Amino acid sequence: MWARNLGNLMMSPLKPIEFLLSLMVMSLLRLAIGVIPMTLLAMFFFDFNVYGIGLPLVAFFCNLIFTSWSLGIFVSGLVLRNGLGAESIVWTLMFGVMPLACIYYPVTVLPHWLQYVAWALPPTYVFEGMRALLIVHVFRADLMIDALLINVGLLIVSFGIFLALLNSARRAGSLLQGGE
């Protein structure tokens, strides 16, 4: 969008699924570039080894990545269809979702009726599972599997919405209008 190259990209033989998969691979590379040096610095300067948590950390972290992919795919579709202005809506949405994902506190802190909303979000399962792992030293596979199932559903829905928004953007001609 920012380089005004999207029109050229969408006229190429690139399939939408290939476009999305390339975005996902690039997100993993960017994540690795950011996370690996920071964890190594934390080990060196603070003697904090996040890798000591083991494989459960990888499973929960993958669930967070899947959640971010589903949201990112949905947002990409919105931006393709409606322009860069749609991005601000998503930033607002994220700040609204963060308290419901129970990042900083357990789900039980929320009012009872709001707990149902929180349990509909995959990050809630991840952070509750991480709390159980760090505080009680118990790996809650049920929470990880529940998060994974919700994430699979969200990814399927976000792929479908992206394809619908991309087709709508092609029909409306908004792919060539985006940019700086």
Language model segments and positions:
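Transmembrane helix boundary and interhelical loop/hinge segments in multi-pass membrane proteins
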Residues: 1-12, 27
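Short cytosolic helices in intracellular loops of multi-pass membrane proteins
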Residues: 7, 11, 21, 95-98, ...
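Transmembrane alpha-helical segments of integral membrane proteins
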Residues: 125-136
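Transmembrane helix segments
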Residues: 75, 79-124
